[in-house]
A protein has these predicted regions:
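TPR alpha-solenoid repeat register
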Residues: 34-36, 85, 143-145
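Alpha-helical tetratricopeptide repeat
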Residues: 1-5, 38, 87
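Short coil turns that delineate tetratricopeptide repeat
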Residues: 28-31, 78-81, 136-140
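A generic tandem-repeat structural signature
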Residues: 73-77, 85-92
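Post-signal-peptide N-terminal segment of Sec-exported extracytoplasmic proteins
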Residues: 16-32
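Secondary-structure boundary/capping motif
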Residues: 34, 40, 89, 133-134
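Short coil/linker segments at helix-helix boundaries
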Residues: 2-20, 43-74, 94-145, 149-156
């Protein structure tokens, strides 16, 4: 797993605001800078993962994780070859899957529940696919990647 280790349980977004702003500015001037995409996606993930925002129904966390996903996918599309990016992408998809696990049937109608289930299954499938790819790329840690795969199903 890739994470920010600054000695705290979870990183404080205020502490990294300058870095985030700098990365955002860099991405506005050069939208093909894969290193900036990687680090910005890492910050989005770190500030919106299970430890930082434990409520699965947190809409802001979901939106930020989608931004992280877009950055990671774009960096992969621009041929950034780094196993850390592949690990980060798998983690992002796993977190996105988690965001759809809460039983909020009271909040959504049947069409919205079907849409959420479809998104959950899509993210789950991609996360597991990326963990399988990582197991092939990094065979010495294959068992660990297999343990990270998502085994639960949509709750409704």
């Amino acid at each position: 797993m890739i994470y920010i280790n600054d000695g705290s349980f979870r990183p404080d977004p205020k502490k990294y605001a300058v870095i985030a702003d700098s990365l955002d500015k860099k991405l506005k001037t050069d939208d093909r800078d894969t290193t900036s995409m990687f680090y910005r996606a890492l910050l989005y993930l770190s500030f919106n993962d299970l430890k930082a925002k434990p409520s699965p129904g947190d809409k802001v966390a979901l939106e930020n994780l989608v931004l992280a996903r877009n950055l990671a996918d774009k960096a992969m599309g621009l041929k950034m070859t780094n196993i850390k990016l592949e690990v980060l992408r798998a983690q992002i998809y796993k977190e996105l899957t988690y965001r759809f696990t809460s039983d909020e049937a009271w909040k959504y109608n049947s069409k919205q529940i079907a849409d959420r289930k479809s998104q959950f299954n899509s993210y789950k499938e991609l996360a597991n696919k990326y963990y399988d790819e990582l197991a092939e790329l990094d065979s010495s840690n294959a068992y660990d990647y297999q343990k990270l795969k998502i085994k639960y199903n949509y709750p409704l």
